[in-house]
Swiss-Prot record:
Protein's name according to its UniProt entry: tRNA (guanine-N(1)-)-methyltransferase
Keywords: Cytoplasm, Methyltransferase, S-adenosyl-L-methionine, Transferase, tRNA processing
Transferase among keywords: yes
Native organism: Clostridium beijerinckii (strain ATCC 51743 / NCIMB 8052) (Clostridium acetobutylicum)
Family annotation (Gene3D superfamilies): 3.40.1280.10, tRNA(m1g37)methyltransferase, domain 2
Encoding gene (name): trmD
MF term (GO), any: tRNA (guanine(37)-N1)-methyltransferase activity
Length: 239
């Protein structure tokens, strides 16, 4: 997948030089580039914003540098243009799954009081992280891009790595443990030490159901229990 990030602060995305995403880039699984919107302005002072018509607080990002940056990005990336803004759908794992199927994506990061309304005709999709305000679109783009790229085959190494994570299958993830076997009186559940993979799988499914029901009952109400889920819950209640 090719990711193009249109931003005034390309240095903020250096986080993608490291860890899992960094390795995916080194292995050519992911192609990620940043385009500095300021490089495309025709203003001799390199300005990319101006006062809003009609008055009001703050500055508005001008259309010319944004649209020219989008057009340049599209020369090598035919993906959807995604804007991080307050009008958009609230981002979740389902949206991440759909976007992970694209061959490319172009992310536009706004700043200041927002973007000129005339830019919206060049935008295919708007995404919001929620009903709160951030300093700029960059801070929203980072978790969105990370979430999407984790779903690209080969990025995590094993498909099971993300299939068992919270939200992928509609549930929160089961509890995780590592060494030592006992810490300050708390012991690792014996079943995880048993080596019986089928029993461990069922235990993890049970705990995932229990944790979701307790912490996120709203999510639990949306899931459809399988025959195995019903059996696992019944066996637990009979003990």
């Amino acid at each position: 997948m090719k990711i193009s990030i249109l931003t005034l602060f390309p240095e903020m995305f250096s986080i993608f030089d490291h860890s899992i995403i960094g390795r995916a880039r080194e292995n050519n699984i992911v192609d990620l580039e940043t385009l500095n919107i300021r490089d495309y302005t025709l203003n001799k002072h390199k300005k990319v914003d101006d006062y809003p018509y009609g008055g009001g607080a703050g500055m508005v990002m001008a259309p010319q540098p944004i649209v020219d940056t989008i057009r340049d990005a599209k020369l090598s990336n035919k993906g959807k243009v995604v804007f991080l803004g307050p009008r958009g759908k609230t981002f979740n794992q389902e949206i991440a799954k759909e976007l992970s199927k694209e061959e490319g994506l172009i992310f536009l990061c706004g700043h200041y009081e927002g973007i000129d309304e005339r830019v919206y005709k060049h935008i295919d999709m708007e995404i919001s992280l929620g009903d709160f305000v951030l300093t700029g679109g960059e801070m929203a783009a980072i978790p969105v891009i990370d979430c999407i790229l984790r779903l690209i085959p080969g990025v995590l190494g094993k498909e099971e790595s993300f299939m068992e994570e919270s939200f992928y299958n509609g549930l929160l993830e089961y509890p995780q443990y590592t060494r030592p076997e006992e810490f300050e009186g708390d012991k690792v559940p014996e079943i995880l030490l048993s080596g019986h993979h089928e029993n461990i799988r069922k235990w993890r499914r049970l705990k995932s159901l229990e944790v979701t029901k307790k912490i996120r009952p709203d999510l639990y109400k949306k899931i459809t229990l399988t025959k195995e889920d019903i059996k696992i819950l019944k066996n637990k209640n009979n003990k």
